[in-house]
């Protein structure tokens, strides 16, 4: 099928689709290996209807090409939407040269690789990162696509690939059940997804708001970060890391650093960050008035978040994104063939698990031979 693509001039160092679309932020972009292009469904601008958006990058001529399949208005509307989605108002070169390198020598060894934080739908971000709990990118990708294909609405089919909308909270509560989600492989996350969807439906009704995204954006109005995080953690299955991912990638709080096992490792290994008793006491006092935070927050990890913000400044979340990608390697996510390629870190851990299993087997066989020798 032939489409007329719009064009946007952008240097690969400022935006590299391969380093952004399937690297642990968004989980529904599909890579077409034959056509060298990405596709997904998204709402364009203020529209409530989903359109299929196709992107490809002409790296040699530094051009981003784009087209929408469906009723999204015009090409200018899509271009404006993509500039907001990719946060192209923020210059990575400026952040490297004027913010990060002067304050962190580690960035002097790096250069902009087009890794930036996306401006995503907060509702989809919330559910996606509930799926991320104790999970890897490949499985999160499968889960997010499963939610759409089973409980979203079919938008269209292109070259045999079916494209669906991301289900709203109402659609999840009316179409999904915990049992069905468990059957689809969501495990204990099934309960969290259903209960979060139900709570959001009730929260919207109380606030007289119909849109999931509009409601989640409304909790930021005149609110401090700690209060927004407290509210997000009131949803079942949402801890500090998931809440911080929603704040950073869904609510555009650029200074927030979600601290997971990878970021914690970077902080301790490369920056020697650790919390002493006084640090923990101060944080404990700080959260006295926030009962959910007091219960859910790991104070040592929260100290890491604060120290990294102090080091990297108002775009600390972006700096974390750069080092996170460097740490784990890329991923190729969903493809039009139906396969989901794995990132470097997943392959390393799987190899380690195989080696450990082989070593354990050798030990068991060795023990068995010793026992047999004793019997003889």
From Swiss-Prot:
One GO process term, biological-process aspect: error-free translesion synthesis
Record flagged with keyword Disulfide bond: no
SMART domains: ENDO3c (SM00478)
EC nos: 3.2.2.-, 4.2.99.18
Binding annotation for DNA: 134, 139, 189, 262
Residues that hold 8-oxoguanine according to the record: 258, 260, 320, 324
Disulfide bonds listed in the record: none
Taxonomic superkingdom: Eukaryota
Gene3D superfamilies, sorted: 3.30.310.40, Helix-hairpin-Helix base-excision DNA repair enzymes (C-terminal), Hypothetical protein, domain 2
An annotated GO cellular component: nucleus
InterPro entries noted in UniProt: DNA_glycosylase (IPR011257), HhH-GPD_domain (IPR003265), HhH_base_excis_C (IPR023170), Ogg1 (IPR004577), OGG_N (IPR012904), Oxidative_DNA_repair_enzyme (IPR052054)
Pfam families recorded: HhH-GPD, OGG_N
Entry's localization field: Nucleus
Annotated catalysed reactions: 2'-deoxyribonucleotide-(2'-deoxyribose 5'-phosphate)-2'-deoxyribonucleotide-DNA = a 3'-end 2'-deoxyribonucleotide-(2,3-dehydro-2,3-deoxyribose 5'-phosphate)-DNA + a 5'-end 5'-phospho-2'-deoxyribonucleoside-DNA + H(+)
Keywords: DNA damage, DNA repair, Glycosidase, Hydrolase, Lyase, Multifunctional enzyme, Nucleus
Main location: nucleus
Active site (UniProt): 241
A molecular function (GO) term: damaged DNA binding
Note: Present with 3690 molecules/cell in log phase SD medium.
Family to which this protein belongs: Belongs to the type-1 OGG1 family.
Function summary: DNA repair enzyme that incises DNA at 8-oxoG residues. Excises 7,8-dihydro-8-oxoguanine and 2,6-diamino-4-hydroxy-5-N-methylformamidopyrimidine (FAPY) from damaged DNA. Has a beta-lyase activity that nicks DNA 3' to the lesion.
Protein name, per record: N-glycosylase/DNA lyase
Organism (species): Saccharomyces cerevisiae (strain ATCC 204508 / S288c)
């Amino acid at each position: 099928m032939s489409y007329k693509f719009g064009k946007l001039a952008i240097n690969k160092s400022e935006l590299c689709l391969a380093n952004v679309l399937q690297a642990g932020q968004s989980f529904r972009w599909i890579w077409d290996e034959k056509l060298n292009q990405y596709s997904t469904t998204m709402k364009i601008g203020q529209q409530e209807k989903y359109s299929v958006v196709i992107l490809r990058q002409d790296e040699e001529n530094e051009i981003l090409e784009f087209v929408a399949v469906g009723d999204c208005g015009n090409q200018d509307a899509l271009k404006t939407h993509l500039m907001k989605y990719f946060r192209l108002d923020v210059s990575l070169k400026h952040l490297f040269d004027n913010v990060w390198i002067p304050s962190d020598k580690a960035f002097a060894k790096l250069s902009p690789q087009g890794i930036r934080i996306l401006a995503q739908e907060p509702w989809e971000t919330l559910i996606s990162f509930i799926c991320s709990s104790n999970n890897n990118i490949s499985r999160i990708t499968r889960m997010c696509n499963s939610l759409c294909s089973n409980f979203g609405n079919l938008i269209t089919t292109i070259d045999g690939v079916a494209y669906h909308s991301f289900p709203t909270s109402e659609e999840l509560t009316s179409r999904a059940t915990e049992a069905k989600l468990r059957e689809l492989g969501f495990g204990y996350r099934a309960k969290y997804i259903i209960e979060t969807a139900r709570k959001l439906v009730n929260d919207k009704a109380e606030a007289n708001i119909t849109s999931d995204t509009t409601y989640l954006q409304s909790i930021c109005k005149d609110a401090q970060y700690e209060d927004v995080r407290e509210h997000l953690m009131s949803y079942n299955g949402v801890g500090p890391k998931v809440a911080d991912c929603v704040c950073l990638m869904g609510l555009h709080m650029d200074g927030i650093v979600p601290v997971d096992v990878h970021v914690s490792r970077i902080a301790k290994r490369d920056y020697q960050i650790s919390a002493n008793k006084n640090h923990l006491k101060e944080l404990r006092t700080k959260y006295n008035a926030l009962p959910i935070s007091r219960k859910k927050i790991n104070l040592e990890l929260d100290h890491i978040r604060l120290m990294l913000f102090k080091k990297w400044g108002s775009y600390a979340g972006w700096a974390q994104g750069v080092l996170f990608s460097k740490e784990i390697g890329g991923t190729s996510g969903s493809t039009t063939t139906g396969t989901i390629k794995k990132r470097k870190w997943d392959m390393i851990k799987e190899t380690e698990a195989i080696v450990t299993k082989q070593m354990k087997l050798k030990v068991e066989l060795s023990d068995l031979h010793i026992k047999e020798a004793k019997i003889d």
